[in-house]
Design a protein with these regions (language model features):
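Short, solvent-exposed mixed-charge patches
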Residues: 224-226
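Cationic, glycine-rich low-complexity segments
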Residues: 41-139
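Membrane-interfacial hairpin junctions
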Residues: 152-162
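Short Lys/Arg-enriched alpha/beta "domain-start" segment
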Residues: 16-42
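One face of beta-strands
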Residues: 23-25, 36-38, 49-51, 64-66, ...
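Sec-dependent signal peptide cleavage junction
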Residues: 2-21
Length: 226
């Protein structure tokens, strides 16, 4: 296991000073079924997530502990074996991490990215997204620093809070939809390993108005797509 699968309520934790959440999930890796039990605790500026990974028979494999301290801008990571012996521990500043969380658009699983290594460069893409008639749908998909919103789902793009603020200030955000508007996307595409035998295609996009005004930068992924 190289990444922590987070509960769908992870984004909410950053909005509350006192928040506790327990969640359970299963996943399949190399034909074997596994279970993860996760406890998330938010206290003030600290968000701690403890994830225990089990075999399908209930045998503990390993434990991953992630602590986000927003007061100092640092993420702490611990990995322990089935006997709870420390395997490794790392800490990263927020500015060292390309994205704190990454979401699989197919399964909506969310995992923490601890490295700014993008992987193998595949291609560069540029295109324009027409937002005419698109509804603005809030998706709680595990962002630590801000809620994530999905616009133009046919291209799998998640637009962050800065985008929403820009649209609102421009008077383009209605009660439930966005008035006609175009966004220009400049995207670098990479192939990056996730777990053993699996790869994710990672997208790093900069978004602009058609007049060239910068809006925001985003990071998303697709599993099993190249």
């Amino acid at each position: 296991m190289v990444a922590t699968i987070l509960s769908p309520c992870y984004a909410q934790a950053s909005e509350y000073s006192d928040y506790v959440k327990h969640s359970e999930a299963t996943f399949v890796e190399n034909g074997k079924k596994y279970k993860v039990e996760e406890d998330l605790i938010s206290r003030g500026d600290k968000i701690k997530t403890t994830s225990n990974f089990f075999t399908d028979e209930g045998v503990l494999i390993e434990t991953q502990i992630t602590t986000v301290d927003r007061s100092v801008g640092i993420v702490y990571f611990e990995n322990r074996n089935s006997d709870q012996e420390l395997i490794n521990s790392e800490s990263y500043r927020f500015d060292q991490i390309l994205e704190l969380t990454e979401s699989d658009e197919e399964t909506h699983d969310v995992f923490v990215t601890y490295s700014n290594d993008r992987g193998k460069f595949l291609r560069h893409e540029e295109y324009t997204i027409n937002l005419t008639g698109k509804k603005l749908t809030a998706l709680v998909v595990g962002s630590i620093l801000a809620g994530v919103f999905a616009i133009a789902p046919e291209v799998g793009i998640s637009i962050g809070g800065k985008f929403v603020a820009a649209v609102t200030s421009a008077g383009l955000l209605g009660a439930g939809s966005i008035m006609p508007w175009n966004v220009r996307a400049s995207v670098d595409v990479y192939s990056s390993p996730y777990r053993t035998g699996k790869h994710y295609t990672r997208f790093y996009g900069d978004f602009y108005t058609t007049d060239g005004e910068y809006i925001t930068s985003l990071h998303w992924s697709k599993r099993g797509y190249h």
